[in-house]
Amino acid sequence: MHLYGDCAAERKQEKNNNMAKKKIYENYIGYTILKPIVDWNLKHSYRKVEVRGKENIPTDGAVIIAPNHCNTLMDALVILRAFDSPTVFGARADIFNNKFIGKIMTFLRILPMVRQRDGLRNVLKNNETQEIIVETLENRVRFCMFPEGRHRPAHSLQSLGKGTFRAALAANAKFGDRFPVYIVPTGLEYGDYFRYRSTSLVTFGKPINVTGFVKGQDVDNEVKLIEPLRKELAARMSELFTYLKDGEQLHDKWALTKILATHQGVRYGDFGTSLHEGMLANREIAARIEKACEEKPEEMSELLEKVEKFEKKRRKEKISIYSFRKKNNVLNIAGESLAALIGLPYWIFSAIVSAPMWLTYNLLRSKTRDRAFHNTVGFGVKLALGIILFLIYTILAFCLLPWPFALAVSLLTIPSYSMFFDYNEGMRRFISDIRLMGEKGLRKSYKEIVKTFNKEF
């Protein structure tokens, strides 16, 4: 009797879960309240955020957003912020193994996506998930899937899985006669994958009309339909961020891209600059590098070896690549010193009031094996503690200080966490500028790499 009761309870729980999942696309008050808070914290997790190409997103059908996956949970969050209306996401199923986290993920409109490596028995669960995806799309709610399946902090693309295309074809089979199904290629570009308070650029490309594509084919075989769709999506995605071909020298090619970009004075994320224009400039440089690798592979291999040695030396000496684009003379150093002194009082204030956050961030970061999660940790800490600390400091300030001073303290606490990181980054680059002044050999290597590439390629 007890066993029967347990089974009945499990079936009831499973039924309730299925009902909840099937309504994952519907509006509910908790999500409506939380989304603006998440969006605000996401915006202030970066120095600069840009969204381009929203005019490319169709309004006459079902839409699947398909971005590259390079920065863990932050990839989903920057997509989420790009829209006012809800977006449902797919994520690795193993994240849902923890029941508490699974409930949070479901609350955030995230579905478990099982991969082949998870075993055949688990893969079969994707049939249920796919039904929910199709229902979501049928109700004209966007669904975001990362075709690569797993994240990798690199300016390239991994092989695209079949999940995105199977979902699109299943949706088209169910309601494609009523309205079309689209896959929108999307490019995500970050100023830095690992440093909190970098930059974020989202670019939506021209959509792939899956319904129109299927109508133009003479085959019903899913495999034969998926392969050309996969090639087309990969080609369009690679046009929306600084793309380099995958391979052993990928990181050296990216390092060379940054070297040439700093030499050309490409301003990426600086005040008054456009992230999109900076990305386009980087793409042109990357295209030149790929062309050189194809036309003169041996010469480029030698140059990339020099780049690798340069990078090892630069990182060992803790010198930022951005220090090379400036004339680090005494006058500039004096100006930077003055700016550091002016900002010091507020940095001290920020360091004190945001200490619970940045200490927690440093602790969690030290225990996070995958560096790609560092930005996610920084965001999570701000989201979890930011409002609580603001309320505590505001109450204390108005209890202990005259209201004008209390109001000032309250307002100054809002950007303190961001200011703390921005000042630290400024100081890191300032110290880097000073160090570079004493590194004649490194400056010489930098100039030789630039000269060699521009002369021979």
Locations of the language-model features?
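Non-catalytic C-terminal accessory region of glycerolipid acyltransferases
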Residues: 20-21, 29, 117-322, 326, ...
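Long, positively charged, glycine-interspersed low-complexity recognition regions
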Residues: 343, 347-455
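Membrane-anchoring hydrophobic helices of lipid-metabolizing enzymes
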Residues: 19-66, 72-78, 83, 107-109, ...
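Cationic, low-complexity basic patches in intrinsically disordered or flexible, solvent-exposed regions
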Residues: 11-13
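Membrane helical hairpin/interfacial module
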Residues: 91-102, 108
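Basic/hydrophobic alpha-helical interface regions
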Residues: 47, 81-87, 130, 159
